[in-house]
Amino acid sequence: MTPIHKLAIAAVLSTGIASVAQAQDTKVAIGISGWTGFAPITLAKEAGLFQKRGLDVTIKKIPQKDRHLAIASGDIQCAATTVETWIVWNANGVATTQIFQLDKSYGADGMVVKPGIAKISDLKGKTVAASAPGTAPYFTLAWMLKKNGLTTKDVTVVNLEPQPAANAMIAGTSGVDAAMTYEPYLSAVRAKPEAGRIIATTLDYPMIMDTFGCTPQFLAQNPRAAKALADGYFDAVAMIGSDAKKSFEIMGADVKQSGEAFEGSSKYLRWQDRAANQKFFAGEHAQFSKEAADLLLEIGVIKQLPDLSKLADTQFIR
């Protein structure tokens, strides 16, 4: 081997080592909540799946109503939230792009009512606890009301996050007739039927779908990291299938639940693998985004429609 060949090989090796080191140093801060659907993100971090793909991930628990502010300030670069929330953020000047789907709710989000309320239309003139406008619980409330001939103007909305909203129902708080919440907090209400009942969930109204996205700047500067985030998530979904006990224990611990309790709450949603992602973004995502955007405009959460064609970039799920 000539000296030139040795130098060439050394250069290739050093470049490869540098590339690995650079990938391992790719830092990304992600904003999520304790929602069951987001848990594979936590699993991917805690089980070292993100790290194996060259990511240094920091997860921050941020209420949905504040997550876009954290993105705008640069505190986080990526987040998980519902499909319609990305519409709100972009319409309000917080540029973000969805890159993969996390989950679909199959009864994991719902409306809880006090005894005596027989149907959703009975809520006219009543008080409902829900997160602030621009969040999934508020959107779910608006969606369910619309499907039953009402609007948010027909009820009084008091702003409570999903966990305290569920707790208010369980405690029988006076002045709260209904509440919008989701798993794992919805199961706490299921266990207390005397406090109220679940009158509707996303089994009745299939409209909660969560996706993961980042700022356009982060995606442009870190395309490999974006791909690693998607692949790390798919690794986590695969791990849930191959080592369920360990996976549920890790995910449950993050929300102070046993693995068994967390597994119970997960039965009301479905995490989406790569094949499901590709199918979702082939048509359903755009169709739902249009319907959701129209409702958001109608209820005054947004003042103008963002460019719906720029809400997602599907190259990272291939």
Please provide the spans of the model-predicted regions.
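Bacterial N-terminal signal peptides that target proteins for export
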Residues: 1-9
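Phosphate-coordinating loops and pocket residues in cytosolic domains that bind phosphorylated ligands
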Residues: 125, 191, 313
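Conserved C-terminal helix/tail region of periplasmic/extracytoplasmic solute-binding proteins
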Residues: 290-318
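Short, glycine-/small- and polar/acidic-enriched structural segments
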Residues: 24-162, 166, 173-183, 198-200, ...
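Cleavable N-terminal signal peptides
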Residues: 10-11, 21
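Sec/Tat signal peptide C-region and signal peptidase I cleavage site
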Residues: 17-23
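Secondary-structure end/capping motifs
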Residues: 220-301
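Pocket-lining segment of extracytoplasmic ligand-binding domains
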Residues: 84-85, 157-158, 163-255
